[in-house]
Amino acid sequence: RILVCQMGGCSGREVRELKIAATERLINKYEVNLSAFMELNYNWATVASSANLASWFRHEEREVRSVAAHNQHETTTRHQPGGTGMVCRYEFLQYARKPSNDFRGLGRWCSWPIYCNPTHSTRVVVAYRTGSGKSKGLRTIYQQQIRYMQLHNITGTPQQLFDKDLLHQCKLWRKSGERIILLLDANEHVLTGKFNRQISRTGLDLEEFTHKCWGAHQPYTHINGSIPIDGGYKSPEIEVLNVCMLPFLDSPGDHRAFIIDISTRSLLGEFRYKVCRPISRRLITSQQRSVDEYNRIVNEQFDRHRIVIRLDAVDKMTRYCGFPAPNFLRAMIIKLYRQMTEIRIHAEKKCRKILRPDSDYSPTVQM
C-alpha cells in the first residue's frame, strides 16, 4: 500500500511537525508500507546525514528508511523549493534496494527499486514537474532550473527538459526489464496535458491509472485548482487493485493525498510471503561490549554538550530562585533533560551493529 502526498513545503519546523503528524496518522490508519512525497522544499545539504527524511518520523516503533532528492547545485539556505522523497517501512524494508535520484542533480525525482528476485524488479518513482508559469522570485523551482539550463547551454523550458529526461530514464528502466510505478505532480491535467501526450509519442508503455477512480466528474487535486494535476502512471504488468483519493481535510498538504493498493503478485512475484523482521535491541546488558560502547558514546556526548556543567548551573539557579521556579528556568531544565534523553537514544542506536545478510528461506515443511 502506497501513500502519495504533495507536502507543499516542510522547511519550517512548526509546519513540518504538523504535516508529519498528519502523515503518520494516515500511515497508521491505513497501514501504509511506502510513502511518497513531492515538494518537500528542503535543502538536505544544509543538515547532517543523520537528519534525513526518516528522522522526521519519530513515532515509528520499527526501523524506517528513506530517500530524498533536492537541487544539489544551490545550497544557500535550508528552504529550497522543490524536491521529492520516499519513506519505506515494515515488511517493505527487506525488498527495498539501492535508491537513485535525478541524474542532473535537480531533485526533480527519486526512485526506489523493490524486488525479492532480481529478475522481477519494480521501480517506484516519485516526481515533481514544475508549472508552466514563470514564477516571480530568484529561488523558485522554475528559476532554479532556468539557471541550470543557462549554465549548461540547454535550450527549451524546464517542463520540456523534465519530460525529455524523465521519459528517457523510464525507457532505460524498461529496457533493463524493470516494472514502473510513476507517481507525479504534473502541474497540468494528467490525461490531456503535454506530459501524457509525450508518453504516447515516445512509445513508452505507461498508462495513467488514477483517473479510473474519478467517477462521473473529474476532481481537482489542488485546493485552489479546477483540474486533476496529481496522478500515477504504471507499466502494463502492474496490477492496481484500489485507488482512494482522500479529502483535503485529511491531506497533509494543499493537494489531495491518495492511497494505492498494488498486488504483491505484480510487485514482487508469485508466492511471496509477508515477512516482517522482529524488533531487535542493540543495547543488551548481558553483552559487556555493547554496554561499554553505550557508556562511551554517552560520556562523549555529555562532554561535547557540557551536560554536567549545565546541570550544576541549573541546580545552583534552582536553589537561588526557590520554588516555584520562573518560566525561563523551567524551560531550561526541560530542554536540558530532553537533550539528555536524545543522547541516550542516539547511543542505544549506535552501541552495536546488527548485520542482516540475505539468506534463503527454509524449504516448505511437509506435514
Where are these regions (language model features)?
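Short, basic/hydrophobic alpha-helical segments
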Residues: 18-31, 116-118, 157-181
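Metal-dependent phosphoester-hydrolase catalytic domains
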Residues: 33, 87, 91-108, 172-180, ...
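Acidic/histidine-rich helix-loop elements
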Residues: 4-15, 135, 140-155
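Conserved, non-catalytic sequence blocks in retroelement Pol enzymes and Pol-derived host proteins
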Residues: 13-16, 74-77, 156, 196, ...
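N-terminal, active-site-proximal structural segment of metallo-dependent hydrolase catalytic domains
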Residues: 1-54, 76-79, 186, 289-290, ...
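Well-ordered, non-membrane alpha-helical segments in soluble/globular domains
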Residues: 16-23, 50, 144, 153-168, ...
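Structured beta-strand-rich core segments of catalytic domains in phosphoester-bond hydrolases
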Residues: 41-132, 246-252
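Surface polyanion/phosphate-binding segment centered on an Asp-His-Pro turn
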Residues: 114-150, 237-367
